[in-house]
Amino acid sequence: MNVCSKKFALLPFVFLIGWLLVTAGLAVAQVSVPTHYLGNGVNMEVVGYNDLQGRPSYMPNVQKQGSRYILYASEHVGTGAYLNPMNGKMEYDGTSILDVTDPQDPIYLKHLPSLYGPPNNEARHVRTCAGSDLPGNLYPGKYFMVRSDGQISHTLWDVTNPANPILISKLIDNLTYTHKESWDCVSGYIAMPKSSTTWKSTGSACTTIPGAGCDIAIFDLHDPYNPKYITDWGLVGQTPGSTVTPVPAMVHETVISTDSVYGTRLYGAYGISVSGDGWLQVADLGKILALGHPVATDEDILAAQIGVQKMSYEFGMHSFWPWLHIPMADFAQNYPASAGPVPGNTNPQVQDFGLASTESTNNGCVGWRAMAVVVDLNYPSEPETIANMSVPALQGKKEFDFCANDARFGSHSISEDLYLPFHNRFNAIAWFSGGVRIWDLRNPFQPVEVAWFIPNINKNTEQNCATRNGVTSCDTVVGTNNAATDDRGYVYIVDRYGSGTDVLQLTGNPKTALFNLTPP
């Protein structure tokens, strides 16, 4: 039986103002933005908005280009072609490029469609680097973008003029699966998820070759005009000749990050979603390079792998991000610890962690609840989950019953930004119908949610449907898909279902704490 209803996920904004003003004394956003663009929140307010031409968006990436701040918003495959009012043409999804130098007035500069038509008319992921940030400073004044084009290619672009991107090359082509790249501008190395005809994985039909799967391709991209393939990468059991069973779940993202103390590491998230059979992996890129040849065996992986954590089956891992060198105010009086049997941190006053998230993939609260977790990396060979970040389905009064609608509810991804004021202090986590949630992680053992914001639906918001006990129903509900931050303290969110992008800022005590750069 199919029952289709179109209704709002939340009660009217005016009602919510009244409720919030009588609870906790927390402020609600009231800014000079059209009323139907305002949302509902605590300790966050809208600064600016753009509808992104009504396109479903996957992730925002903010790049400072000289004195300008440029937002690159990647796009999911939508219901078809959308009108680009800048040229009057119907275009498939790709990348929206905006100037957000003035966050109150985001200016749409360019829509860059995917290189391909259906079903690959999308570009879900985007990463950028300044030429001056890459090793060797070979191209000062230039800016580069890598994106996934459909499920076919990872492509490289010159975006020095963001209103006129120029295709440089296809880094990898002729694939059947692409996903979330990670480009480390410090080392120049990039990790790109892809389909493989030889490497193995479970959990997704990401290749048409029986017994094959998905892995990571690592390139040296310090010179964008001369990319160099380094190796494929994955988990023990996924290499071409491995006989390990069961074969581990597919990779979603491997972050490459360079640290002044630990060098360049890989932080891999495998399994993706709830019931995804997740894994977290830490590896040393220097040891991969020291092999002198592409990784081909499980023994090669073990030579470079620092540690791995098998998650409980319900937690597939979507993202894994380093959260290192955290000043621990509560440990300020602790003396150094004795060295352990394996290499690790011995200073309790400054500790190492990672942030990871599961993706909520089931609409209507069917199955396990997705959440984010904190991982202890003081001894990276033995990573250990120590805390979680979860949002209750019934938050306050009944207008916040997130399981009462047909949308996704749960975590999707953590924000991956490397600069203050957010980095190593607060993190913005996208929570689909739960909007964006801001977590204070200055004490990673005890994460505290300090702010949140849920946009309202608008004329562009697409429907979500869920099937429970054989009955299908539909709602029009927002889906905050990803969040990013910049060095000015703004938060950028994009909507999976076409509601646009919001530029937000913290208010009240969280804003004060964010810009107080001393330990709590």
Model-derived regions, located:
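Feature marking well-ordered beta-strand scaffolds used for ligand recognition
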Residues: 28-520
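Bacterial N-terminal signal peptides that target proteins for export
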Residues: 1-15
